[in-house]
């Protein structure tokens, strides 16, 4: 099982406080809860900064204490207005850079635009663009959690620590699901099978994979550079020179590979945003005989009508971490539960500031985790 720092809740960590400044880059007060938890664990005060919107909707950041020669940690959690969130971060990073901070470490538990990390049709790899902007602004190190694709780390030319929330979710399963030994870990599509396998192997449980219409359709659009030529061009091409094209994909009827009858089904994924695929998976699992259904994910974006749809669905409980604030969604849907991951973020900050190795936080993590 993954290793988690043994710091007890509320305990103050052993940290060299001199030369450390902790900022929250959020102008939205509801997004500052995670920052406060981290500061409390580290036993430090939040740095003095003012982040607000001008009447013309421009973002303004005013650093209200000296950061010269200090390690500055900027915590930024993503709000509904993701573009404002990004501008707040970039402006604060640049302000610290021009104020001669020794190092500027971004603590971004959920990396925005991480779903746009592949070329689709005539679009762009937006997460690469965002990584370049952060580095150009002055970021010297990034702490994040469960990137949507691990390859995003390669978009940066600075150190990136991609922490894992799995230890906390595994602990929740063991402590909060009394009969979890009768559970099966479910991947709602073949794309998430590796993550499900990682959970199943650590809990010594079986695995099931849902395949068919419920799987994500975005995999069909990975690269659109195969666009067919125009009709005029086709007429000009000799038949013998036509380039063979891939046969279009046709999804089979939805099916479950693995036995879930009379079991608890635990669906695992990294992000839960649009919940349609999770609802379809839950209905399928119910039809196959699962008597209880849990959904576990690191990042709970829970956009649009997600809380209402979850409340009305066959899902019994949705468990997410607090990488993204979702207090309003919890009020709308009591099925949503939160796991606090401030402990591991605090430990990462402490180790980086004290110049200690980060390898402890990655023990027992394999290439597929």
From Swiss-Prot:
<comment type="similarity">
    <text>Belongs to the ribose-phosphate pyrophosphokinase family.</text>
</comment>
<comment type="function">
    <text>Seems to play a negative regulatory role in 5-phosphoribose 1-diphosphate synthesis.</text>
</comment>
<dbReference type="Pfam" id="PF14572">
    <property type="entry name" value="Pribosyl_synth"/>
</dbReference>
<dbReference type="GO" id="GO:0030234">
    <property type="term" value="F:enzyme regulator activity"/>
</dbReference>
<protein>
    <recommendedName>
        <fullName>Phosphoribosyl pyrophosphate synthase-associated protein 2</fullName>
    </recommendedName>
</protein>
<keyword id="KW-0545">Nucleotide biosynthesis</keyword>
<dbReference type="InterPro" id="IPR005946">
    <property type="entry name" value="Rib-P_diPkinase"/>
</dbReference>
<dbReference type="InterPro" id="IPR029057">
    <property type="entry name" value="PRTase-like"/>
</dbReference>
<dbReference type="GO" id="GO:0006015">
    <property type="term" value="P:5-phosphoribose 1-diphosphate biosynthetic process"/>
</dbReference>
<dbReference type="GO" id="GO:0005737">
    <property type="term" value="C:cytoplasm"/>
</dbReference>
<dbReference type="Pfam" id="PF13793">
    <property type="entry name" value="Pribosyltran_N"/>
</dbReference>
<dbReference type="GO" id="GO:0006164">
    <property type="term" value="P:purine nucleotide biosynthetic process"/>
</dbReference>
<dbReference type="InterPro" id="IPR029099">
    <property type="entry name" value="Pribosyltran_N"/>
</dbReference>
<dbReference type="GO" id="GO:0000287">
    <property type="term" value="F:magnesium ion binding"/>
</dbReference>
């Amino acid at each position: 099982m993954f290793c988690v720092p043994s710091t007890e809740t509320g305990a103050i960590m052993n940290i060299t406080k001199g030369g450390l400044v902790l900022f929250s880059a959020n102008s939205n007060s509801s997004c500052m809860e995670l920052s406060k938890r981290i500061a409390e664990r580290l036993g430090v005060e939040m740095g003095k900064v003012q982040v607000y919107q001008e009447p013309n909707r421009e973002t303004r950041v005013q650093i209200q204490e000296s950061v010269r020669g200090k390690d500055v940690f900027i915590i930024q959690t993503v709000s509904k207005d993701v573009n404002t969130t990004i501008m707040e971060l970039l402006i604060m990073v640049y302000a610290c850079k021009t104020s001669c901070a020794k190092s500027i470490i971004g603590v971004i538990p959920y990396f925005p635009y991480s779903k746009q990390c592949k070329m689709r049709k005539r679009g762009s790899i937006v997460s690469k663009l965002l990584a370049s902007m952060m580095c150009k602004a002055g970021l010297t190190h990034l702490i994040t959690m469960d990137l949507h694709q691990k390859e995003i780390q390669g978009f940066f030319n600075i150190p990136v620590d991609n922490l894992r929330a799995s230890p906390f979710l595994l602990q929740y399963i063991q402590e909060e699901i009394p009969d979890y030994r009768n559970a099966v870990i479910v991947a709602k599509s073949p794309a998430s099978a590796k993550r499900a396998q990682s959970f199943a192997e650590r809990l010594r449980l079986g695995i099931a994979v849902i395949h068919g219409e419920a799987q994500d359709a975005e995999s069909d659009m990975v690269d659109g550079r195969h666009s067919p030529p125009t009709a005029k061009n086709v007429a000009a091409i000799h038949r013998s020179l036509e380039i063979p094209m891939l046969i279009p994909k046709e999804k089979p009827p939805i099916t479950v590979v693995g036995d879930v009858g009379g079991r608890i089904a635990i669906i695992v994924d990294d992000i839960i945003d649009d919940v349609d695929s999770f609802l379809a998976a839950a209905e399928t699992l119910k039809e196959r005989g699962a008597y209880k259904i849990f959904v576990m994910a690191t990042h709970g974006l829970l956009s649009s009508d997600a809380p209402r749809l979850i409340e009305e669905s066959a899902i019994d409980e949705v468990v997410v971490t607090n990488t993204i604030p979702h207090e309003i969604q919890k009020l709308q849907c009591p099925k949503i539960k939160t796991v606090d991951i401030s402990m591991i973020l605090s430990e990462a900050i402490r180790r980086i500031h004290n110049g200690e190795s980060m390898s402890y936080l990655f023990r027992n993590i394999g290439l597929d985790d």
